[in-house]
């Protein structure tokens, strides 16, 4: 009788982590950053229809990198959770920390117990108010949660991008400068990424309940000082 095939738990976890990291590294990166006027999230994304960034609730935004269908399912689940909690209790009870913990529990369970881990990293951003500071939560493929106060970088080549962005980051400057810094950090040694290949959202307190706003291509182009494609 043949002996059953044995893999050490340490090796199994390492293989799963390597598998997830390789899948995430193939995706284009994003940067989320806090500045004195709110939160900006900038993602390299040439698609106009498949969004990597979206609204979760009044003051909460979501960003995902990696396998699109996997992080989009998590986005939808987060919206449902936030809506139900806000309906059952109060809108003020919906916060990024509890949502990040929910994502972390799910990702950790899948990583530990399922055959294939999810090839995703998630950003949950919440605009602060009088009671809470602005927060950025980065959730990794294995359920690890990192609480960032200034900025977070997700996706392929994240360490190098974070190093470039750290040298440019200025929380007291205007939003346009922060957007330019994010574009420069994402571009690296390549030619600057064009406005058409960037997805940009902001969380800003404009005196309304909803703080999420998606910047149109023309707004991004103007902020970056780029010329429209085809113009002389």
From Swiss-Prot:
Subunit description: The 20S proteasome core is composed of 14 alpha and 14 beta subunits that assemble into four stacked heptameric rings, resulting in a barrel-shaped structure. The two inner rings, each composed of seven catalytic beta subunits, are sandwiched by two outer rings, each composed of seven alpha subunits. The catalytic chamber with the active sites is on the inside of the barrel. Has a gated structure, the ends of the cylinder being occluded by the N-termini of the alpha-subunits. Is capped by the proteasome-associated ATPase, ARC.
Activity-regulation annotation: The formation of the proteasomal ATPase ARC-20S proteasome complex, likely via the docking of the C-termini of ARC into the intersubunit pockets in the alpha-rings, may trigger opening of the gate for substrate entry. Interconversion between the open-gate and close-gate conformations leads to a dynamic regulation of the 20S proteasome proteolysis activity.
InterPro entries in UniProt: Ntn_hydrolases_N, Proteasome_alpha-type, Proteasome_asu_bac, Proteasome_sua/b
NCBIfam families: 20S_bact_alpha
UniProt source species: Acidimicrobium ferrooxidans (strain DSM 10331 / JCM 15462 / NBRC 103882 / ICP)
Listed name of the protein: Proteasome subunit alpha
Pfam families with a match to the protein in the record: Proteasome
Cellular localization per UniProt: Cytoplasm
Molecular function as annotated in GO: threonine-type endopeptidase activity
Domain of life: Bacteria
Alphabetic keyword roster: Cytoplasm, Proteasome
GO BP terms, alphabetized: modification-dependent protein catabolic process; proteasomal protein catabolic process
Pathway: Protein degradation; proteasomal Pup-dependent pathway
Family (UniProt): Belongs to the peptidase T1A family.
GO cellular component annotations of the record: cytoplasm; proteasome core complex, alpha-subunit complex
Function: Component of the proteasome core, a large protease complex with broad specificity involved in protein degradation.
């Amino acid at each position: 009788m043949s002996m059953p095939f044995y893999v050490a738990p340490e090796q199994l976890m390492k293989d799963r982590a390597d598998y997830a990291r390789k899948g995430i590294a193939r995706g284009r990166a994003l940067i989320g950053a806090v500045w004195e006027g709110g939160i900006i999230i900038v993602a390299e994304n040439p698609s106009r229809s498949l969004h990597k960034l979206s609204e979760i609730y009044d003051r909460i935004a979501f960003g995902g990198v990696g396998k699109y269908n996997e992080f989009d399912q998590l986005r939808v689940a987060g919206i449902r959770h936030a809506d139900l909690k806000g309906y059952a209790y109060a809108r003020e009870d919906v916060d990024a920390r509890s949502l990040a913990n929910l994502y972390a529990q799910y990702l950790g369970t899948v990583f530990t117990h399922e055959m294939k881990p999810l090839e995703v990293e998630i950003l949950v951003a919440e605009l602060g108010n009088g009671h809470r500071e602005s927060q950025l939560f980065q959730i990794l493929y294995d359920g690890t949660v990192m609480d960032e106060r200034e900025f977070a970088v997700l996706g392929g080549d994240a360490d190098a991008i974070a190093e470039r962005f750290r040298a440019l980051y200025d929380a007291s400057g205007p939003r346009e400068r922060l957007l330019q810094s994010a574009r420069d950090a994402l571009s690296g040694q390549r030619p600057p990424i064009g406005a058409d290949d960037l997805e940009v959202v902001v969380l800003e307190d404009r005196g309304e309940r909803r703080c999420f706003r998606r910047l149109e291509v023309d707004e991004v182009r103007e902020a970056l000082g780029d010329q429209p494609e085809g113009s002389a």
